Amino acid sequence: MNTNSELSLENLNAAGDAAARAIPPLWPLASSVAVNPYLGQTAETLALAGARLGRVGGVPVTMPRAWYAARIADGTITDADLSAALAVNPTAAADLEALKAHAEQPESAQKPLPTLADLAADASGIDWPGILADRIGLWAAGYFDQGQALWAAPHRRGAYDAWRQYATHDLTPEIAGLSGFAQFVSETPDTADQASTRAANRLGLSDAALETYLHQLLFTLGGWAQVARYRLWQAELAGKSDATITDMLTIRLLWEEALFAQYEEEIGAEWEKVVAAHAAPVASDADLQVNAVLQEAWERAGQRDLAETFSMPAPKADDTRPALQAAFCIDVRSEVFRRALESLTPDIKTLGFAGFFGLTPAHKGFASDVDELRLPVLLNPGLTSTSQGDDAEADQTARFKARASRAWGRFKLAAVSSFAFVEATGPIYAGKLVRDALNMAPNDVPGGPMPRLDPSVDLAAQTDAAETILRAMSFTDNFARLVVLAGHGANVVNNPFASGLHCGACGGYSGEVNARLLAGLLNNVDVRRGLVERGITIPDDTIFVGALHDTTTDAMTLYEADHPSKAHAADLKQAKAWFLSAGSVTRAERALRLPRAEGTDDINLRSRDWAETRPEWALAGCKAFVAAPRQRTAGRSLEGRAFLHDYDWQQDKGFGVLELIMTAPVVVASWISLQYYGSTVSPDVFGSGNKLLHNVTGGIGVVEGNGGTLRTGLPWQSVHEGEDFAHEPLRLSVCIEAPREAMSDILKRHDGVRALFDNRWLHLFALDENGQMAWRYEGDLEWSQMPVASEAIPETEVAA
């Protein structure tokens, strides 16, 4: 079949590149971070993205209608919310009553266009989509393996060449009924470009049909396409390119060609209709527009509640020198701990800043040669650091132990020796099994020698970095005697997603290395002298101490040994007591949300429980991002649902810090928020399924069962507590106290960030001089004034 003119390689490559960029990247498990599953659709509205994803995968982008109807019925969503949302898209319904009527009616299910594999399955009764997913998955698990496999696949070839070598010896497709598949593969052109051009022309694809059809083929590969997209992402960060994802597209296209060659007579006519449907422009239908309006209305309801929170009484500004200042990551889990800590005494002040603390190191841990990229995945490393100490003997001993452990592990898993291992050494593990089963194993706390820059940088560069970071934190005066810089990390067992519970701003690692590095920088006497010349004076009696906040148990570890100071012994003792008390208060609050947690002791036990699928809720529930002075949120409960970034625009000359916040932390927070959103509204596609069925493959990700499609996104247990959702899928509300003109100027310069707000993947609000949500960004650089939630209550004195 070829009813169209020949496709040009240029057009095919352009469409293939667009399809590749419609796929989000997937980071490996060792350093996994949240990724926006709609990353390739942010230039479109929610309804239009729903039409596109519906065509290629049948993906819902909102909750079922009944979800919204229930919230309309119980008053959560008011008529005012519905009317305001309808004003954004007035063509969705004739009026308010019509919109309510739509909410009561179930929408039509999104059905994807069939692939050739689907059509061949219908014609033959053979599950070709399942077979090709299994065969491609089996090959991809070996090809992308990151050290889990005992017999690793060679990486000398590109993905296309490696697959051809594999597929010519794979008889499973022929056994299943695809005659001559191995021969077909052996006769494919030597280059992926030639192979994809031949296949596309043989299938009769038009230029117009390529866009969504090629996207669909990559979409059917699930996480394997996302692993390939990750390779392209990393290559482009380094100023290079990578063809893995286009090779994967060629592989999937060749499967279509092979199936078409066998079943053309049975499916040819139906296939022509599919090609024509792919060629039609993507457009949202009435159902999708109604759904988008209902989602908007629900978010308006949440924003009403947020505005009420901002209108609550705030503690009076206190310029006296605090006894303790503690800087935490902006992560929503920090909000609960910060609130608990500040409630103990007015002498404690907390700050919020991105958890990488402005440093972008490629770090080598103690006795390790692995580069850990402890920085946001949007950036390249700007520094190198190490925890290698001066004790060469200790380093070598640790390396010997690590090698012995790896060798022992391979002996346990090898094809032959594994049987002898179980027979000979099984009883030795009885004690360990009992200890682990009873949750008696101690929590692991990252330690090691104090990290340092290696190589170091000159004093001017160190001073520049210190000034930039302190100004970005709006932290340039009134320093306490003790300033704790707290990174964060999780402490769990038997959890492939452990790195996803760590600090996203640190690339999926815990944040203590960055915190300790910054503490060392700010304790440097020469750096402090340089800062004085730049208008920042840190008192001689101020000491900075790195720390780690364990978000699973809310324990705090201080690394005071990095900078021993007898003069601060009493300060440290008092701080540790405060942290213990705050941890207890925080655990009590978290226990109210966690299933089967009856008290603070249960929280500690959960972190060591092999069978616990919900050791913590991580960022479930996130709904807001606030960049403002701490005074605007202090003393108010944001329920662990808000990212809190300290920012004082009056100290920000030229609005460079504001630009950094809007283009980095806000974007990272959007990735987190939209990953939770996608894993909730479409768990079958954008979620990784049931933890109880997971098998780790290749150190990359997980599959459900014994192979097939790599699952991505969050497990079901991360967004659902068994009876109801733990996460409410709300697009993030970003609240910034800064002039609207400054924010608009930044949006003008950054098209990608502007698209997030213009297309309502994020909502933007300007806080006024009283910290109230006063202005809403409507898109296209336009703002509208908001009704005052209630009269702002005056500041109040804080009781000592």
Curated annotation (Swiss-Prot):
GO terms for cellular component: plasma membrane. Disulfide bonds: none annotated. It is a peripheral membrane protein. Pfam families: DabA. Its main location: membrane. One of its GO terms (molecular function) is zinc ion binding. Its cofactor is Zn(2+). Keywords: Cell inner membrane, Cell membrane, Membrane, Metal-binding, Transport, Zinc. Zn(2+) binds at residues 329, 331, 488, 503. The keyword Cell membrane applies. It is found in: Cell inner membrane. Part of an energy-coupled inorganic carbon pump. Belongs to the inorganic carbon transporter (TC 9.A.2) DabA family. Forms a complex with DabB. This is Probable inorganic carbon transporter subunit DabA. It comes from Roseobacter denitrificans (strain ATCC 33942 / OCh 114) (Erythrobacter sp. (strain OCh 114)). The gene is dabA.
